[in-house]
C-alpha cells in the first residue's frame, strides 16, 4: 500500500473559522476525514499531521523519508520565509507537493513568493480544499512512475 503524509502548517488548525471567505467553511478535522476517505479509494494510506511550530514540521519531513512515499504540504505562512523547511525538503528524496487553499499569487504581495516551491515536486494553489485531492492524485501518479 502506498503511504502519504499530509502536513498542515500554522493556523490551518483554524480552518472553517479563520477567514472563511478565503479558506472556506471546512474544518481541519472534516478535511482530514474527507482526504483519508478519498485516499483510501486509491489504496493510499494517509497520515495527517498539523503543527504551528516550524521545528515539529521539520521533524515530520525528516521522519517521512523512511516512512512515506510522498508528502502533501500546506506550509501556511512558512511558505514565504522558512529556509529551514526548504532545506528539510531538499534533504530528502521523498516527493513533496506544496498546496495552498487560496491563490497565493493573487493575494498580498508578501504572499506571492514561495521559498519552498523550487525544492518541491509541484505546487497547487487557489483551488480550495480540492487542491489536496489533486495533490494526492499527482503524487500517486509520481510514485507509480507515470508522472516522471
Curated annotation (Swiss-Prot):
The keyword Amino-acid biosynthesis applies. One of its GO terms (biological process) is quinate catabolic process. SUPFAM superfamilies: Type II 3-dehydroquinate dehydratase (SSF52304). One of its GO terms (molecular function) is 3-dehydroquinate dehydratase activity. Its EC number is 4.2.1.10. The keyword NADP does not apply. Pathway: Metabolic intermediate biosynthesis; chorismate biosynthesis; chorismate from D-erythrose 4-phosphate and phosphoenolpyruvate: step 3/7. Substrate binds at residues 74, 80, 87, 101-102, 111. It is an enzyme of class 4 (lyase). The active site is at residues 23, 100. It catalyses: 3-dehydroquinate = 3-dehydroshikimate + H2O. The record marks 18 as: Transition state stabilizer. Keywords: Amino-acid biosynthesis, Aromatic amino acid biosynthesis, Lyase. NCBIfam families: aroQ, PRK05395.1-2, PRK05395.1-3, PRK05395.1-4. Belongs to the type-II 3-dehydroquinase family. Homododecamer. HAMAP family: AroQ. Catalyzes a trans-dehydration via an enolate intermediate. This is 3-dehydroquinate dehydratase. It comes from Anoxybacillus flavithermus (strain DSM 21510 / WK1). The lineage of its organism: Bacteria, Bacillati, Bacillota, Bacilli, Bacillales.
Amino acid at each position: 500500500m502506498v503511504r502519504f503524509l499530509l502536513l498542515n502548517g500554522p493556523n490551518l488548525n483554524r480552518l472553517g473559522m479563520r477567514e472563511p471567505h478565503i479558506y472556506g467553511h471546512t474544518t481541519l478535522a472534516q478535511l482530514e476525514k474527507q482526504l483519508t476517505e478519498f485516499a483510501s479509494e486509491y489504496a493510499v494510506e494517509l497520515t495527517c499531521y498539523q503543527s504551528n511550530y516550524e521545528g515539529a514540521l521539520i521533524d515530520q519531513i525528516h521522519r517521512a523519508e523512511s516512512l512515506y512515499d510522498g508528502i502533501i504540504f500546506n506550509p501556511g505562512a512558512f511558505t514565504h520565509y522558512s529556509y529551514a523547511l526548504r532545506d528539510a525538503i531538499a534533504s530528502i528524496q521523498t516527493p513533496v507537493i506544496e498546496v495552498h487553499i487560496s491563490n497565493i499569487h493573487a493575494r498580498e504581495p508578501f504572499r506571492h513568493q514561495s521559498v519552498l516551491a523550487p525544492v518541491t515536486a509541484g505546487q497547487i494553489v487557489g483551488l480550495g480544499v480540492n487542491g489536496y485531492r489533486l495533490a494526492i492524485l499527482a503524487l500517486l501518479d509520481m510514485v507509480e512512475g507515470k508522472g516522471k
